[in-house]
Amino acid sequence: LKSSRGFSISLGVAALNTSIAAPQHQPDFEASKIMAEKGKDGETVLVGDFPFTDRLRQQVKTLHLFELQRVAGRTPPDQWDDILGRCSVLGLTGTTLLTRAMATYLEKAPQAYTVIIGPTTPLSPVLFSHGADVLAGSQVVSPGPVFDGIRQGMSFREFKKLGIQFVAWSKDTI
């Protein structure tokens, strides 16, 4: 995890996730639903473009999409710092840990209810002490079919149906 190389960091996070399991009796909730509920009256920041982005935009008062790729509806990067200082909800892709940007986002939005989202989310309770409120990631429950899908070059969206379980862990339950 201390490497400067993205691939090495990814392997470190994957290894970490194999050794840490979220508590078994978590409420059944999705990251996008939590963000919609928490963001209905304020400003929501979503770092990374997710399949639920358009739906979330309809469910919150204001959605700011922080995305480096030029996608429709993204917020210009020169506005990010100001928005982070006042947002009420912050959704971060777990990839921000790999790119070394997570700490910066957490420091600039200490007031925000923060959800870390996606298959690269480290399911480590350490993140709760650094500002995360919810860890919404995934675990492999059927390794054989998932590994076969990876070997065949399937995308995550394709092989997740083969044996991936989505999990969400709230700091309120620890």
Regions found by a protein language model. Give the residues of each.
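A short acidic, amphipathic alpha-helical/loop segment
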Residues: R55, Q59, A101-K108, V126
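Structural motif
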Residues: V45, V89-T93, V115
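A short helix->loop->beta-strand "cap" motif at the edges of active sites that frequently abuts
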Residues: K61, A109-Y113, A132
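Histidine/lysine/aspartate-rich catalytic loop segments that bind and position anionic ligands
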Residues: F52-I83, S88
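Electropositive, gly/pro-rich neighborhoods at or near active sites that engage anionic ligands
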Residues: L1-P51, I150, V167-I174
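Conserved acidic residues
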Residues: G42, S88, D133
